[in-house]
Amino acid sequence: AEKQPNGEMRDIQTQSIAIGDGLNYEKPACNPVLTQKDLPEGFSKFDFRDPKIWREADGTYSVVTVCLAEDGSGAAALFQSKDGFDWHFVTVLERCNNQYGKMWECPDFFPLDGKQVLMLGPMEMLPKGEFHNGHNVIAFIGSYDEATHTFTKENVQLMDGGIDFYATQTTLAPDGRRIMTAWLQTWSDTEDKPQGCKWFGQTICPRELHIKDGRILQTPVRELDAVHGKRTFHENVTVQGETSLEGIKGRVADLTVTVQPGEYRSFTLKLAADADHHTSLTYDPYTSQLTLDRSYAGSRADIVHRRSCKVRSQNGALKLRILLDKNSIEVFANDGEQTMTAWIYTP
């Protein structure tokens, strides 16, 4: 920590390494291996964190970190090392330029289906388009020239339009799939643990990532299919008023629903519902808005409980897959073109 002129103590952020076998680790004397002196001039020593490291095909190592640039907003910096101990600065992959929030967090940088993705979590965003206030997770999709270490973004997308989704990280499965996890919570509700709850917070069901038409698609990992229990099917159901379907009940379910075009103003699914509680998912075919609302899920906290995102409808048709767990809901629209995620602490 460093004492400021006003007497405040501020932590200095540096990067260090530890060597171990998965259980026991030792910190070498060369730590820290990256400090402010390794950053471009004007970058902050107080905001330099969240390293994501990977091994390149030639055996060298790369790491992407986030830092605060001289303009007071985030940047993603790339470093490389031959041995994992001696690191050098390579380039700034992307700058916020005060367009996407302020400081950035939890960066990731990886190839996907012929494109290159820089994924990270902006803090303090203002609402614009599909982005909402506060913490978001966004992906810059583009190309990467390895010879010049130049990342060129082509598209920018929000990774989840729900309420609780942050701090994404990916890994490469042995079969080549890019698998993503995330914190199924957000900083704004970390102090609102339900009374009597012995734990708080979780991660999402791991998701496979692919790119189609310049956009990242997210689907639950295929391993989930192997653990399904009883399957129930309903076809060509005409819904009038409030309708319950036989065999569709419980707090743990993997639901696939296809909403067909029709003369209706809105369509609502009530999930984790009893006489006093429910979480609703409402589709408005006229505006193509999908709204997740947990206002009646049982939380007493004064936090965000409702959020909407625009989905692509085909003349009013919409396909939904919903992972309902005891304390969470994950929604995948149109085979993962959009997702919406939220925790629920329904009794």
Tell me what each language-model feature is.
Residues 138, 143-164, 169-347:
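Beta-rich accessory regions
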Residues 49-52, 105-108, 166-169:
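Beta-propeller and closely related beta-sheet repeat lectin domains
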Residues 1-50, 55-99, 111-161, 184-234, ...:
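Beta-rich carbohydrate-recognition and catalytic domains
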